[in-house]
Amino acid sequence: MDADFDFVVDYDVPDKISYKIELLEKFVGKDPEAVLIFYGGEPMLCIEEIRQIMDNVKAKQFNIQTNGLHLNKLEPEYVNRLSTIFVSIDGTEQLTDYYRGEGVYRKVTENIKAAIKNGFNGEIVARMTLMEQTNIYPNIRWLLNNPDYSFQSIHWQLDAGFWKNDFHKRPFPEWVNEKYNPQIRQLTEFWVNTMETQGKVLRLYPLLGVMQSLLLEEESLLRCGSGWANYSIQTDCHIIPCPAMNGMKDYYLGHIQHSHPLQLKKIYVTEPCTSCKILGECGGRCLYANITQRWSNEAYSLVCETVKNLVDSLKTSLPRVKTLIDTERIRLSDFDHLKYNSCEIIP
């Protein structure tokens, strides 16, 4: 994976939609199962465009990934039509504000509660971004049960492998080995214990998605769906395999004016993922990171070790979970979730 690839990047991709909504309406109309996800940047900075799209484009459902700061500015008639809201929050107030700025945690939780009060009854997913200041186990426990807003669904993503020159500036190896990996095992134990004691499968997406595959004995492609089930539309109409690949011209897969959403080229992960022993269980960690290879082999292998640790912890717990299903303490259907909804599953 040691590489320093050059990519043709279009730095002139506009900040906001530069095409007529009718063009998007026609494109999406070719797929009767289309799901639209508002993604950024921060999509709530383009509220008028969100309104226009929801008013005119016929999609099976609408979802959004947002920092949550402007959620109160979109009228309930639109918010309540969203199926899933992914909101960026990293754990406790102290940790979230450390990463995102003073007052962010309080504003986000207030906006979430207001949305629910105004009639939103879809799924709200806490989307955590993890760096070395995060202790994942206590922060997930906090998000699940706290006096501000207790989340029913949580996902987390490691901020690792996305930048070229940050690895040597960070205590990433120490954090992985001393904090993150041990706490993932602790979290898995808590997750299964909750099934045993409460008969409840908590919607912790990285655990939920992989455990379902283990139970069904199925292998998976890239679990977020990027490049083969999910595609992103740039503000200039070009179609890319992953929203993180904005402006990467070598990976433009079409244009909404003349492409068909069900006939787009598929892009899959390559090495080092394709020779990995757990590829079928993992599916690949991130298409953008796999293609750009910002970190060295040695550095990125630590990221892969976090995935192997997560998968191994779930495999270790698999017999207990099967027993709980056999004894009807929980059901296999408790692991059902909407796939390819922009939740990466693999952190």
Each language-model region and where it sits:
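C-terminal accessory region of radical SAM enzymes
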Residues: E178-L214, H238-N290, R320
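Radical SAM enzyme core and accessory elements
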Residues: D236, E271-P347
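Short acidic/His/Gly/Ser-rich catalytic and metal-binding motifs that mark active-site loops
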Residues: M1-F5, Q94, F162-F167, R285
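Short, compositionally biased "basic patch" segments
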Residues: M1-D6, Y11-L23, L82-T84, S88
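Radical SAM enzyme [4Fe-4S]-AdoMet core and its adjacent flexible, acidic
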Residues: D6-V9, S18, E102-T109, K113, ...
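Radical SAM/AdoMet-radical enzyme domain recognition
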Residues: I21-I37, C46-D159, P173
